[in-house]
């Protein structure tokens, strides 16, 4: 039986390279993983006062994470770190206090950015280890660079052999990591 993986992408751009990379991951993922993108672009900015109200977008995202066996966070690099959109989703799912739905779910990290920098995933590791998140984090990540230098073609297909290899290695290792839980 395959593991259900909630994929949270920290970009809602219609031309998001992160979405294109996830589409590629979905096409190459081992049968042991079922990658499901959880849309977070419509989430209102987290506000603890809203925890007492019915916010359909909060409920939808929380339920999707709750129903998953594992999680992958995918982010562009914004000013040397992860995106505000991803951070907002992390906050929404980790609240109300004491009711975090992240706890114990094996986490994979990926970033698609201009340089291939690991800075966003390094910062996310710290968050994932926090008391309200407490996720086992894969000891590797997928960092894909060259997005403005031909990694993707005009049809949105990943054509960089290096990036393809990075993502293939990541998803195979992540499947092995998730199988331990």
For each feature predicted by the language model, list its residue ranges:
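N-terminal beta-loop-helix "entrance" segment that forms/cooperates
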Residues: 40-56, 151
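A generic structural motif
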Residues: 30-36, 133-135
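A general structural signal for well-ordered alpha-helical segments in protein cores
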Residues: 18, 22, 58, 86, ...
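Short beta-strand/turn micro-motifs composed of small residues
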Residues: 9, 39, 111
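N-terminal beta1-alpha1 ligand-phosphate binding loop
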Residues: 2-32
């Amino acid at each position: 039986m395959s593991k259900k993986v909630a994929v949270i992408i920290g970009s809602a751009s219609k031309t998001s390279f992160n979405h294109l990379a996830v589409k590629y991951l979905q096409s190459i993922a081992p049968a042991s993983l079922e990658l499901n993108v959880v849309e977070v672009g419509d989430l209102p900015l987290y506000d603890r006062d809203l925890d007492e109200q019915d916010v359909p977008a909060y409920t939808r995202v929380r339920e999707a994470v709750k129903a998953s066996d594992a999680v992958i966070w995918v982010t562009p690099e914004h000013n040397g770190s992860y995106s505000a959109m991803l951070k907002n989703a992390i906050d929404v799912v980790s609240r109300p206090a004491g009711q975090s739905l992240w706890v114990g779910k094996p986490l994979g990290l990926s970033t698609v950015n201009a340089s291939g920098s690991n800075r966003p995933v390094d910062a996310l590791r710290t968050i994932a280890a926090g008391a309200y998140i407490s996720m086992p984090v894969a000891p590797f990540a997928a960092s894909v660079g060259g997005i403005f230098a031909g990694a993707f073609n005009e049809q949105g297909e990943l054509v960089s052999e290096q990036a393809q290899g990075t993502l293939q290695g990541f998803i195979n290792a992540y499947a092995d990591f998730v199988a331990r839980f």
